[in-house]
């Protein structure tokens, strides 16, 4: 039985199993992919954004570390694609350090897992206060983000914290249909 089919069957069982399966995939692959970054706050699509995902949980539960480079250009994109794993660790340690300095409450966890059509969406919460984000637009996190797993590729959606979950899902559904 194909490996991908087995993974999808596991994801269908429960939210907890879904979270665990996605986490295991991230942990094993370390770097899944570099995907496009959609900024939904101004309803525009920005191509060339980078999304890299890797683990950072001390308790080995469903906690992940997420880095989104504020610098979007082809040179850095190519650099990250070819960067050795050890240097990539250092890159994101430094990058995420900026967020830790801004907020001691820094944490990202899987909040929910939803099935929209054939694709899976992970809704995650970032605890960085919105007032800090408003002061410095270069900070990598807003208060509510979502990931979609599409053909083994991770997409990050940055959303306004004042939007409702229903609005988020509507936005995601629209984008998913365009993939």
What are the residue ranges of the model-derived segments?
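Conserved polar/disulfide-associated segments of primarily extracytoplasmic proteins
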Residues: 46-143, 147-149
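Sec-dependent N-terminal signal peptides
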Residues: 4-14
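N-terminal "mature-domain start" segment
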Residues: 21-51
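Soluble non-cytosolic domains of exported or imported proteins
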Residues: 29, 82-89, 166-170
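Sec/Tat signal peptide C-region and signal peptidase I cleavage site
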Residues: 16-20
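Surface-exposed amphipathic alpha-helical segments
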Residues: 38, 151-179
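A mature extracytoplasmic/lumenal domain signature
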Residues: 36-38, 44-45, 70, 125-128, ...
